[in-house]
């Protein structure tokens, strides 16, 4: 099964996340199929959230299931996601 989820990177006490498409059997920060964007929860810059909406829609159409946090971020960028 493929999920759209967050993968942590950044230094200690300064988290940043990649929004990635990954197989559920892979570790959180392990290999992924495709990166869809990035998210800075500390909002240190104007573009703290960037998502490739076209590719996100493609993966959702292919059956990728977003995690709860990824679902919230995708919806904030206008990606249409059906109910669970």
UniProtKB/Swiss-Prot annotation:
PANTHER family reported in the protein's UniProt record: 30S RIBOSOMAL PROTEIN S16 (PTHR12919), SMALL RIBOSOMAL SUBUNIT PROTEIN BS16M (PTHR12919:SF20)
Keyword Ribonucleoprotein: yes
Cross-referenced SUPFAM superfamilies: Ribosomal protein S16
Disulfide links within the chain: none
Keywords: Ribonucleoprotein, Ribosomal protein
GO molecular function: structural constituent of ribosome
Family from the record: Belongs to the bacterial ribosomal protein bS16 family.
The organism's place on the tree of life at top rank: Bacteria
Residues annotated as signal peptide: none
Matching InterPro entries: Ribosomal_bS16, Ribosomal_bS16_dom_sf
GO cellular component: cytoplasm; small ribosomal subunit
Protein name: Small ribosomal subunit protein bS16
A Pfam family the protein falls into: Ribosomal_S16
GO biological process: translation
Residue spans crossing the bilayer: none
């Amino acid at each position: 099964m493929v999920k759209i989820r967050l993968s942590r990177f950044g230094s200690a006490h300064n988290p940043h996340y990649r929004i990635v498409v990954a197989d559920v059997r892979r570790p959180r920060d392990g290999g992924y199929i495709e990166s869809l964007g990035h998210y800075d929860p500390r909002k240190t810059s104007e573009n703290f959230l960037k998502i490739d909406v076209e590719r996100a829609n493609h993966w959702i159409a292919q059956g990728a299931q977003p995690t709860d946090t990824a679902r919230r971020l995708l919806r904030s960028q206008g990606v249409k996601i059906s109910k669970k």
